[in-house]
Amino acid sequence: MHFKDLGLHDYTLKNLMYENNCCKFYDAVDENNISYVLKFVPSDVTSEGDTFPFVDRFQVKEGVFLVYSSNDFGKEGTDYFTYTGSGGNEVHISGTSSEAGIKPQFIETCHPKHLKRGTKEQEDINSSTSKKSAVINNFSGEKTPNPRPQSSNISERETYVGILNVKCKNKNSSKIRSEKLVSSVIETKHTPGLASILSKEGTTYPNNADGKHISIVNPSSKIYHSSHKQIVKTPIPKSGLSPIERCPFNGQNIKCYSPRPLDHESPQRDFNNNFQLRILKSSVLQRRQSTQNS
């Protein structure tokens, strides 16, 4: 396709280099056979504005052409449109660091709560860099000395990316000691914590008391059945007891109860005794039935 008298030069499109939903890139030359890159933006697509400087611009019926110098794309590499540039977050590096001449990459780490390290913490970091250590590079796998051991003094927030392999002379297993802050407990000669429990219940704690005198019953030791019923003992009337008689048994006098009173004073008393006896029997029967049902 040939464009004449539309821009500063006459451009001839050679081939399509790249295409997406919003634009197309063409390889083109002018009348002097100088290479250019033309970007075509259709008229129905709203462009936010190109940040890359163009050398020429002209409009056609279908859209707008932006002309870029091919030398400007040459410094970015052969793949113009997938290169992230300085604003990209990720750069894919192929090959080893020694062959490509890539400098060790550093990442910026932030201290917790965005606070500066204290004097003691900074001294520990400086002393750790002076120890003998080997760094295994992620790219080549070869052991190289730790780069820039004095860099911790210059920049506190730079950390070398790699696998740190520290050689320890001590063959025994190292023990890590951790210090925990424990709230101070006032130790007394009494059982700790018992005085506070008794004070909440309003019970005074004597000075000469011993923890052995206090027994705590575990409530879980008493297990009740779901159909448990509290059985009330039936009171035995005192007047219902028969008089005691002495019954000889093997030459010994044994106390035994007579089935009915020895002295019959009146029929009214016999009636009362029989009535109380019937009540006693009925209560016993009720207790037996309740236990059998349960």
From Swiss-Prot:
GO terms for cellular component: cytoplasm. The keyword Magnesium does not apply. The keyword Phosphoprotein applies. GO terms for biological process: positive regulation of transcription by RNA polymerase II; response to salt stress. Induction: By salt stress. It is found in: Cytoplasm. Residues 115-153 are annotated as: Disordered. The modification Phosphoserine is found at residue 266. Keywords: Cytoplasm, Phosphoprotein, Stress response. Residues 125-153 have a biased composition (Polar residues). Signal peptide: none annotated. Involved in salt tolerance. This is Halotolerance protein HAL1.
